[in-house]
């Protein structure tokens, strides 16, 4: 046992210090990024925000809606091959280039992933997603996927420390997913005591990844557009959002009614709700590590996305970043004891 004395920070612990800017308008800010990925060699340009691979966020409907904003969607792994085939036939190539195919790490997952990718050459992104990216089995699966899919962009995670980011990149990941426990419906930290404050994880993992020519995605911890800006400011190449995109028409979630008001269920993918739906229940040897919440219906996701992108552009103008790529170079974080005036409530 040992204790690390360094204080680790989450998004709520800091603000971005404003700096002199030559920008006259938020409209001058370029949010599009261009990447050429380490292993696949593929190039991609777009707004580097990703809808999370949760079954009530990363849906086909969400992918179609977000593609119009040049934003990615990690489509959840629970669609059938037949549903994928119908989707691929229905949507244009401009949507498919914004889609990540999510997979677990079982042999059945591997076979299904290959079958989905074979449906269209336009499917170029793979998202290998497990709660604990520190297992040898996960690394072996990543290596197997890289060997089988040399020309696809592979995003793999989740981890929170630099040495594991390096191992995953050296094992074939183009992008490493960073975050353990920060999600809005994740209870891993309280069930297990394991985790890492998200901003510090992003800063440290970005440093490790960029040294090897890889990228990271900050997964979890964002509750307001300002948190998205902080993640990019901390060095994230991509930011994955779950709760901020939940509850919309495109989420295809379960709608319940209470006292005449309608709500949409939103739950973590390690929650009892998710395990009952997809694997028949919580196994006797494990605990649920997610919760279920009821969200008021939020309408079309378009308006939320515009709010997020608008906040991100505004953050760039406050520090003089003409392009999103420049935000991390222009960011100075200050530690704070408060974030906002709550006289009339939060946000």
Curated annotation (Swiss-Prot):
Q: Which domain of life is it from?
A: Bacteria
Its UniProt entry gives the catalysed reaction(s) as: IMP + NH4(+) + NADP(+) = GMP + NADPH + 2 H(+)
Task: Give the residues annotated as active site.
Answer: 186
Residues that bind NADP(+): 108-131, 216-239
Name the record gives this protein: GMP reductase
Similarity comment text for this entry: Belongs to the IMPDH/GMPR family. GuaC type 1 subfamily.
Gene designation:
guaC
Coiled coil regions in record? none
| Record-level GO cellular component terms | cytosol; GMP reductase complex
Q: Which UniProt keywords apply?
A: Metal-binding, NADP, Oxidoreductase, Potassium
Q: Which NCBIfam families match?
A: GMP_reduct_1, PRK05096.1
Keyword NADP part of the UniProt annotation: yes
Organism of this sequence: Serratia proteamaculans (strain 568)
What EC numbers are recorded for this enzyme? 1.7.1.7
> What InterPro entries is this protein classified in?
Aldolase_TIM, GMP_reductase, GMPR, IMP_DH/GMP_Rdtase_CS, IMP_DH_GMPRt
Which CDD domains does the record match to this protein? Answer: IMPDH (cd00381)
| Chain's role | Catalyzes the irreversible NADPH-dependent deamination of GMP to IMP. It functions in the conversion of nucleobase, nucleoside and nucleotide derivatives of G to A nucleotides, and in maintaining the intracellular balance of A and G nucleotides.
Q: Which Pfam families match?
A: IMPDH (PF00478)
Oligomer status and interactors: Homotetramer.
What GO molecular function terms would the record report? GMP reductase activity; metal ion binding
Enzyme class comes to: oxidoreductase
Any idea which positions bind K(+)?
Answer: 181, 183
GO biological process assignments: purine nucleotide metabolic process
């Amino acid at each position: 046992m040992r204790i690390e004395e360094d204080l680790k920070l989450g998004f709520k612990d800091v603000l971005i210090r404003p700096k002199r800017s030559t920008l006259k308008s938020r409209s001058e800010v370029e949010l599009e990024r261009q990447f050429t990925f380490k292993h696949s060699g593929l190039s991609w340009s777009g707004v580097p925000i990703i809808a999370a691979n949760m079954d009530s966020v990363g849906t086909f409907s969400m992918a179609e809606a977000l593609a119009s904003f040049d934003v990615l969607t990690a489509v959840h792994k629970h669609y059938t091959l037949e549903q994928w085939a119908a989707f691929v036939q229905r949507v244009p190539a401009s949507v498919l280039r914004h889609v990540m195919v999510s997979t677990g790490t079982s042999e059945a997952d591997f076979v299904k992933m290959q079958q989905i990718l074979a449906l269209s050459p336009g499917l170029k992104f793979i998202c290998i997603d497990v709660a604990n990216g520190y297992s040898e089995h996960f690394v072996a699966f990543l290596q197997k996927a890289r060997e089988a899919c040399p020309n696809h962009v592979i995003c793999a995670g989740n981890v929170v420390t630099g040495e594991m980011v390096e191992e995953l990149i050296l094992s074939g990941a183009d992008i490493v997913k960073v975050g353990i426990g920060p999600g809005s419906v994740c209870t891993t930290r309280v069930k297990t005591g394991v985790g890492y404050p998200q901003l510090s994880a992003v800063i440290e993992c970005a440093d490790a990844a960029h040294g090897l020519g890889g990228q990271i995605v900050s997964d979890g911890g964002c509750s307001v557009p300002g948190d998205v800006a902080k993640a990019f400011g901390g060095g994230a190449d991509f930011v994955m959002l779950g709760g901020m995109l939940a509850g919309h028409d495109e989420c295809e979630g379960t709608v319940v009614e209470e006292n005449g008001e309608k709500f949409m269920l939103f739950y973590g993918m390690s929650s009892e709700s998710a395990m009952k739906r997809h694997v028949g229940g919580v196994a006797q040897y494990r605990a649920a590590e997610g919760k279920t919440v009821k969200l008021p219906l939020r309408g079309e996701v378009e308006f939320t996305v515009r709010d997020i992108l608008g906040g991100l552009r505004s953050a760039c103008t406050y520090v003089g970043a003409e392009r999103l790529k420049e935000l991390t170079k222009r960011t100075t974080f200050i530690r704070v004891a408060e974030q906002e005036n709550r006289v009339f409530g939060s946000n």
